[in-house]
Amino acid sequence: AGVSSSDGRAGGVVAALSARGLKGVPVSGQDGDAAALNRVALGTQTVSVWKDSRDLGREAATAAVSLAKGQKVAGAKTWAEGAKKVPMEAMFLKAVPVTKDNLDAVIKAGHISKDAACKGVDKAAAPAACK
């Protein structure tokens, strides 16, 4: 399996596996970028963890305004799970693991067009989102 911290790195894993003629190896990434979502549709990447950047932007702006006013950030929680267990305030937004089974979620959200997500996909073996 190839577990990557970003979809860009996952693309490198997919390219390396392809160069070796290896198929069916689970590969994960994060970001929900267009190339990765296309790889999910093609079946060369198993999952991309997506966080809607519009939600991230809204929450970041709201947090910045609260902090500028000297207020606590609504919804922030204390998190101390790092290697040194240093407590800090954090907000965790919903992450969506996008697979071939729910690829339509990012299309319906307007994050990517169906044409871009499904480019080059064989219609006979296509996930439901590409039919």
Which positions does each model-derived feature cover?
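Hydrophobic alpha-helical
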Residues: A1-R39
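Sec-exported extracytoplasmic/periplasmic mature domains
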Residues: V14-L22, A41-Q45, T62-K69
